[in-house]
Amino acid sequence: MAQTNPLDGDKHRAMLQRRLQPRDNPFPEGRWPSLDDIVCIPANLSRLVIDPYREACSIDVSLGRDTPTLQLPFLVSGFDTVPEQVQKALGRALQTTGTGYIGKQRIADNIVWIQWVDDVSPADPVATGYVVPWSRAAQCLTVRQHDAFTGISVSRLEEFEDAVEFALASNIDALFLDGMDGLSDPGNALSQQPRFDLLPYTVSTLRRRRQEEQITLIYAGGVRSGTDAAKLIAMGASAVVYGVAVALAAGGMINTTSIDYATDWSMDERTAGVTALLQANAGEASMMARCTGKTRLHNLEPEDLRVVTLSSADMMGIPLAGTRGVDLSSQG
C-alpha cells in the first residue's frame, strides 16, 4: 500500500478489503487443549534475571530408589517391535545422551531400562526397574523385588485415587501418567488426544494427602519438544517420555495408525538423528528454565506458567494470562 498513489482511493479501498477478510479462528469450538497454549513468564517480570553466560542450568534427575541418575530428564518408549537396526541405533543414542528406556526388552547395555511387566513379559532381573499397568499392580507387585525401582502406569482419572492410595501404602517409587495409553501400545499415540490433566490432578491428589514428595511422577503422551518437557516438569513431572518424536528422528514415517521406517537410512544416520533430537530438546528445556530465572530445570513450578485459552486453563490447572488462579474442583 505504501507504493500506491495516495490519491487512488479505489485501489486503496480494494487492498484494504482484501486484508480485512476474516480468517479461520485458530481456537475453534471443541479445540483440544495443547501445550502450545502454555507460555512461560519471563524472569524480568517476576524475579532477578540470571546470567545465562555464567550460571549453568542443571537438568539431570534421579527417578528414585537406587536408579542411576539420568543425564537428561527423558525416557523413550515404543520401540519393542521396530526393526533391529532401529533398536540398535536407538540404544546407541540413549547410551550417548544418558537417556532411559521403557519397554518389554532391553535394547542396549549400560542404559537405564525400566521394564514393562505384564502377563506375557515377566520381570527380568537385569532391568533397572519395573513398571506395571494399574490393572495388574496388585498381582504383579506382591512378588516384586522390594529393592528395585517400581512404578505403576495409570491412564484414567477415575483410577487415580485408588492408584495413589496403593502406591503410598506399597512404597511404590513412581507413577507413570500415560496420557495416551502409549506405553503399552505405541499406536495409540497416533490416534488419541493427550490427557494433560492427569498431571495436575495427580499433584493435587498427592498434595491433599501431604505426600507430594513421596512419589516420582513421569508423564507420557504428546511430548514433542524440550519446551513441552519444561512445561510438564513445571507442572510437577520429574521426567517425560518421548515416543513418536524419537521415531521420526530415527527415520520413521507416519502411516495413518502406524509408523514405518525408511529402509535407506544407515544405523549411523538413525543414531545421529535421535541423538540430535534428545540433545536439542535438553538444551531447549534448559533455555526455558533460564528464561524464568532458574538455574535448575526441576525448580520450575506452575507459578512460572500461564495459559492463553480457557480450555487449557481448565484441563491443566494453570492460570489464564492476566489472572492469578484457576479452579481445580472441576477436574476429574
List each language-model region with its residue ranges.
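Generic secondary-structure signature for well-ordered alpha-helical cores
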Residues: Q95, T99, A169, P200, ...
